[in-house]
Amino acid sequence: MQQLEEVVGQAKAEIEGVNDVATLDEIRVKYLGKKGFFTEQMKTLGALSAEERPAAGAVINQAKQQVQDALNARRDALVEQELNQKLAAETIDVSLPGRRIENGGLHPVTRTIERIERLFGEMGFKVERGPEIEDGFHNFDALNIPAHHPARTDHDTFYFNPDLMLRTHTSGVQIRTMEHQQPPIRIIAPGRVYRNDYDMTHTPMFHQVEGLLVDEHASFTELKGILHDFLRNYFEEDLTIRFRPSYFPFTEPSAEVDVMGKNGKWLEVLGCGMVHPNVLRSVGIDPEKYSGFAFGMGVERLTMLRYGVNDLRAFFENDLRFLKQFK
C-alpha cells in the first residue's frame, strides 16, 4: 500500500513536469501501458488468496485511476497551451468564422443608363456609340456650329489641338450614324462627355444620352409623345410636363423640357427639338424629303432627381457609405 502511494506521488510529479504531449505519452506507457507498472501490479494478485484479491485489486485500481486523472488533466492543459501559442504566433486565426463576401452593386449612374436604354429600347430605339476623342467636324461643324459661331465659346472644351478634342456631347454619334445609314433612323447615344467645369452641379466628366429619329414624317408632336412616355416611365409618376421654347444651333424649333417637382417648382430635365436642315444637309440627307428630331439629357441630373441626391460630385468620390445605398 505504501509502495503504491509512493508510485502515485512519483507519477504525478513526473506528469506535472512534462511540457509536451509526446513526453506525457511516454509516462502513460510507463505506468499504464501493457508492460507498465500497474499492469505488473495486477499480475501479482494471483499470488493472493481469494479473500484478499478484491481488496488488493480495488487499491491498485484506485491508484491507477489517480494517475489516469493526472494524465488527463495535464494533457488538456498542454493542448490548450499549445493552441494558445499557435494562435499568438499566427497572423490569421484560421479557426475564426469566415467573413461574408458582400455582393457588389451597380453604380447609380450605370443603373440610370441601363434604365434609359431599356425604356427607349421598348420604343424601338437602338443604342449607338462613338469615339470620346472627336474632331471639329463631328463635334461642331456638322451640328450647324461653324468656326465663327458664338456657341463654340459656350462649351468649355478640352482641346488636344485646334481640330481634336474630348467630345462635349454625344451628338457626334448621331452625325456618324447619319453618315453611314439612310433613314429611317431611330437611335440613342449614351456615353461620357467632357467639359471644363466643376461645382455642385457640374463635373469635368459626366454622362449624356442623346436621341435621334429621322424619317419622312417625323414631327414635333411625335417628339413630345415619346418624351412624355419616357419621363413618366422613368420617374414612375404621372408627371406634369411642359415644353419651354429654347435655342440650340442644331435644332429648329428647340425646346427645353421641365417637370413639376414635389415642391411645386419646375425642374429642367432635358433639351430637344427638330433637327436643323443644315445638319441633315451636312451628312447628305435631303431635308426636303426627311425630317427628324433630337433630344439630349444629362444622366447624372436624372439620377440626382430620381434618388434625391443634392451634390453631383458624390457620384464620383467612391464613398462606399454613399454607393451602398443603391445596391
UniProtKB/Swiss-Prot annotation:
The places in or outside the cell where this protein is found are: Cytoplasm
Gene3D superfamilies documented for this protein: Bira Bifunctional Protein, Domain 2 (3.30.930.10)
A Gene Ontology CC term for this entry?
A: cytoplasm
Residues noted as binding Mg(2+) in the record, renumbered to the chain: E252
InterPro entries according to UniProt: aa-tRNA-synth_II, aa-tRNA-synth_II/BPL/LPL, Phe-tRNA-synth_IIc_asu, Phe-tRNA_ligase_II_N, Phe_tRNA_ligase_alpha1_bac, Phenylalanyl-tRNA_Synthase, tRNA-bd_arm
The cross-references to CDD domains, in alphabetical order and at most eight, read: PheRS_alpha_core
Instruction: Name the coenzymes or cofactors required.
Output: Mg(2+)
Q: Does the keyword Metal-binding apply?
A: yes
| GO MF annotations in UniProt | ATP binding; magnesium ion binding; phenylalanine-tRNA ligase activity; tRNA binding
Say if the entry is tagged with keyword Nucleotide-binding: yes
Task: Give EC number(s), comma-separated.
Answer: 6.1.1.20
Quaternary structure (record):
Tetramer of two alpha and two beta subunits.
Task: Give the family from UniProt.
Answer: Belongs to the class-II aminoacyl-tRNA synthetase family. Phe-tRNA synthetase alpha subunit type 1 subfamily.
Q: How is this protein named in the record?
A: Phenylalanine--tRNA ligase alpha subunit
